[in-house]
Amino acid sequence: ERRLTDLHEAFRRGLMPEQLHRLTGIDPWFLDNLARLMEVEGRLRSFTLSELPPELLVEAKREGFSDRRIARLLQWPLDGDSNLSHDQVIRQRATLVHAARQAQDLRPVFRRVDTCAAEFASETPYLYSTWESGPCESRPSDRDKDIVLGGGPNRIGQGIEFDTCCCHAVQAIRAAGQEAILV
């Protein structure tokens, strides 16, 4: 954690990715991406929500910035009369960022991962969300749905018990006549 904070500070002080690569040995790919995120942060800091250009909001979302992070970075008028905690203020501001996105019809779309390399149709498509423009490829149904939350990333040697449990849960949901969504 400290290393990332130090990199953040080094970029803030003007060091370039090439310099940091020589000093740290960190792969330039990671440093270039971190520098790009810092550059977006810097641009966000120069706007209020009402001044924020829609294309910068889209760029921030594409780069993975949450509404909460955007709310932390934007300039806000001083509110000396507020009895809210800092966290409550940030949550309130994140709600305003979310509302601004909705007003601009800025929402993620879902795309399909072709797990069969176009060799044949996949019966269990994988979807991912993206802020890229284009059509949404999900096909929601009117059926009742249940969500199965997977165990997340596994490390080598952990075993496949979590995957097996998720598969059995999905099979049970389908047997009950409902649609299963595995996250």
PLM features: residue spans?
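ATP-dependent carboxylate/acyl-activation modules
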Residues: E1-V183
